[in-house]
Amino acid sequence: MRKTMLPLAAALLACAALATPGLAQPTVTVVDYGGTWQAAESKALFQPIAKKLGVTLREDSLQTIADIRLQVQSGKPTWDVVALGIGECLAAAKEGLFEPVDYSVVTNAADFPPELRGPNYVPGTVWASFVLTWSKEKFKNGGPQSWADYFDTKKFPGARAAYNAPRFMLEAALLADGVAKDKVYPIDIDRAFAKIRAFRKDVAVWYTSFGQAVDLINAGEVDVVPVLDGRIIDAIAKGAKWDFTFNQGIINAACSAIVKGAPNKATAMKFLNEMLDPELQANLTNYFVYGPMSPKVYATGLIKPEVAVKLNSYPANFKMQVVLDPHWWADNRVPVQSRWDAMMKE
């Protein structure tokens, strides 16, 4: 009996050893804003990273940082990596919702300007630009090319839509009022509000989401509207007879972080590093039209030239724009939003 049991025990141990790697395969849960954007990001970035690292990928979506707060407050978060706008990152980091970044692991972050990374967050994957767009049917000889043109309804008559939020709109108002790009911050709040208050009578629709802005474009309800570049590029690709300019665009960074108490922190840290890899970020342009954030992405040679020139982070386009200052907004968002809401009720 003893002689029979020993070989059997050895066989069981061997099977267990073979099974262990599969059972122990690391898992990482990555969270973004969902929709078509996250679907594209998953194919271009998340899935290739998971394959490269040999980890099991899970995904979820969020709406606001309140969702992250609930994860942390539960005491047993299920999320690991979250991707956000940089303003949301600053707010969440201030609340202590993120793990400290181990920069000895996230070495790709060194490629980015220091103002885009912090102790608890790193740069994200893409930039998004708030740009001026117009109907080519209304303006057959070229539409408004600056925020001054947007606010000038005599020079460029036509139905205007405007974003019902202070972020982006205050910057646009100051640029329209003659403030130089490098002097936009700190925002002269009184001056910006005065410009917008005088403009209110000329606005046909105050939209509340960028999806609504695209609906207005497709329905032909307006002739001039500021919107995110990815939205208008997609609308044009689907047949909208519109055009846009990156001139004086307001370009906003994204960021990524690890949720406080993340169940797979070590794996998440490696995943975070790969998200900043320029070659992997270049792959995003095969699926979506927002410009990758890595400063080295265009040097990879992996982005088709005809695609590169249409992206907001392409050097010639980037230098035409104003980089939104998330630190100013983190310090001023609440009082400015209150003032905006009061103005819209006047």
Named regions from a protein language model:
Residues 316-346:
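Conserved C-terminal helix/tail region of periplasmic/extracytoplasmic solute-binding proteins
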Residues 80-83, 205-206, 223-228, 243:
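Paired acidic/hydrophobic, glycine-rich loop segments that form the ligand-binding mouth/hinge
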Residues 89-91, 218, 223-241:
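A ligand-binding cleft/hinge motif common to bilobed small-molecule-binding domains
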Residues 131-138, 174-179, 253-267, 272, ...:
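A bilobed periplasmic-binding-protein/Venus flytrap-type ligand-binding module shared by bacterial periplasmic
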Residues 25-91:
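Early extracytoplasmic/lumenal segment of secretory-pathway proteins
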Residues 128-130, 190-199, 236-262, 298:
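Periplasmic-binding protein-like
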Residues 259-320:
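Mature extracytoplasmic/periplasmic domains
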Residues 33-42, 77-79, 83-216:
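Extracytoplasmic ligand-binding site segments that recognize negatively charged/polar headgroups
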